[in-house]
């Protein structure tokens, strides 16, 4: 049995003909080669493809499509060559079906949860040009020219140029082209990810979709930049330059200076106006963020008498949208600049019943309960990794009547919800929200109540 399984297992570089059965969390197709699972990038259910194996492990392999031999009946022509929109080959209704099913499957299979209501998915308001923030990378094209775009699928060292990003607005695309034209005129070089030299690394463009404001941040290695000519070439409401010394590719950290304009971008959401610093987290789909937070408010069932803890509060978006319906809101966030923005946003909007603190939730939760009292409702909006078991225990110790969990990853929501259910909570409702059309990413909001 062992020798048969070993013989069936492909090796790196092998080419396989595969039929795709389903889509995995994360968006890759799932196929089987003599019973051995292969995750295939660039394929959808029903496709028969030729794929090359990039990684082979004992239980599964990862491969990428090199040719679609027989397309699925579901497959449609892509709107554009865009590595950031891998699901554009599926009709939008089919995307919604798959995402909703994946949320339910994760909760049932990973969390072993049952008895909850999986509510209809909230579709996106716009299938294209919905992002308010894009992060591009600089690279060198095949002819030696400077390019600005996205990483090629599965490649950390190759950047594909982007003439028109269909996830960004026309104005955002124009700004990218202005920066690229300036950089080419200056004769600047891109960061070489193999040799680890070169100047230009990333370009981050953020747009206030409801205010019209534009924020641009150029990320480079340490070195000289003609900032005066950059200011002349790029017209926006806030222009920043970040010098990054880390060898790994990241737009976070480094030394950031404001070259022109205002230090924060303004955006309107749920009747409030938010000030957003260059590195602050803000949902990248403004319209759907408003709907997501509306779902959170609905599930929180606030009547104006509750104390709400907003954990992983960021710049205060969720907490401040709930404040008008609660007695008080207390937010906690480990990133200090985000907390400063949250405090400023509360003042800016004259919200008097919201307080925000900087701290590690694992360490701060007990002191917060001792000082402020037990919360009636806890709202959590953690990163993709979800909550640690210790953070879940701290929330359970506080004994809120309701927990509203805003999740960007159902595979980490599932074990967190299972831990809460084991402690006596009931998972009542889960509603998926499609924030990111044309991609495999899915958000959802879950309600857990104390028995």
Task: Give the role of each language-model region.
Residues 31, 46, 85, 203, ...:
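Residue-level signal for inorganic ion chemistry
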Residues 2-14, 225-451:
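Rossmann-like S-adenosyl-L-methionine
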Residues 157-201, 220-245:
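Internal alpha/beta scaffold segment
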Residues 1-81, 93-94, 153, 309, ...:
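Terminal RNA-binding accessory module
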Residues 119-126, 193, 202, 206, ...:
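Short, solvent-exposed loop/turn elements at beta->coil junctions and helix N-caps
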Residues 205, 211-221, 273-277, 377:
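Short, aliphatic-rich beta-strand segments
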Residues 43, 52-56, 137-141, 206-210, ...:
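Short beta-strand micro-motifs enriched in acidic
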Residues 66-77, 81-190, 210:
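Extended interfacial segments that mediate partner engagement and assembly in macromolecular machines
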């Amino acid at each position: 049995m062992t020798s048969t399984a070993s013989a069936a297992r492909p090796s790196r570089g092998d080419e396989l003909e595969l039929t795709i059965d389903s889509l995995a969390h994360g968006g890759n197709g799932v196929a089987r080669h003599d019973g051995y699972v292969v995750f295939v990038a660039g394929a959808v259910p029903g496709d028969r493809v030729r794929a090359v194996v990039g990684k082979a492990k004992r239980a599964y392999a990862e491969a990428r499509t090199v040719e679609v031999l027989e397309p699925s009946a579901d497959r449609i022509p892509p709107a554009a060559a865009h590595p950031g929109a891998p699901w554009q080959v599926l009709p939008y209704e089919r995307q919604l079906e798959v995402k909703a099913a994946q949320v339910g499957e994760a909760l049932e299979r990973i969390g072993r949860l049952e008895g909850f209501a999986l509510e209809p998915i909230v579709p996106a308001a716009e299938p294209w040009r919905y992002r308010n923030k894009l992060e591009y990378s600089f690279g060198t094209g095949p002819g030696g020219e400077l390019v600005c775009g996205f990483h090629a699928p599965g490649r950390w060292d190759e950047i594909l140029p982007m003439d028109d990003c269909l996830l960004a607005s026309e104005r955002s695309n124009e700004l990218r082209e202005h920066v690229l034209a300036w950089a080419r005129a200056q004769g600047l070089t891109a960061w070489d990810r193999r040799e680890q030299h070169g100047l230009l690394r990333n370009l981050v463009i953020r747009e206030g979709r409801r205010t019209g404001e534009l924020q641009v941040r150029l990320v480079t290695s340490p070195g000289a930049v003609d900032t005066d000519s950059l200011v002349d070439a790029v017209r926006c409401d806030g222009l920043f330059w970040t010098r990054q010394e880390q060898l790994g590719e990241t737009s976070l950290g480094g030394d950031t200076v404001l070259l022109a304009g205002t230090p924060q971008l303004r955006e309107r959401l749920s009747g409030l106006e938010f000030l957003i610093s260059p590195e602050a987290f803000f949902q990248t789909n403004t319209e759907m963020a408003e709907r997501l937070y509306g779902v959170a408010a609905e599930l929180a069932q606030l009547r104006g008498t509750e104390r709400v803890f907003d954990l992983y509060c960021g710049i205060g978006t969720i907490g401040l949208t709930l404040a008008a319906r609660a007695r008080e809101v207390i937010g906690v966030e480990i990133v200090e600049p985000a907390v400063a923005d949250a405090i400023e946003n509360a003042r800016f909007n004259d919200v008097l019943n919201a307080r925000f603190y900087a701290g590690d939730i694992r360490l701060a939760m007990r002191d917060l309960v001792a000082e402020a009292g037990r919360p009636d409702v806890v709202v959590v909006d953690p990163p993709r990794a979800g909550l640690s078991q210790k953070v879940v225990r701290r929330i359970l110790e506080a004994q809120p009547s309701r927990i509203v969990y805003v999740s960007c990853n159902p595979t980490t929501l599932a074990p967190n919800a299972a831990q809460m259910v084991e402690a006596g909570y009931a998972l009542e409702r889960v509603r998926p929200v499609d924030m990111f059309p044309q991609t495999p990413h899915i958000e959802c909001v879950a309600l857990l109540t104390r028995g």
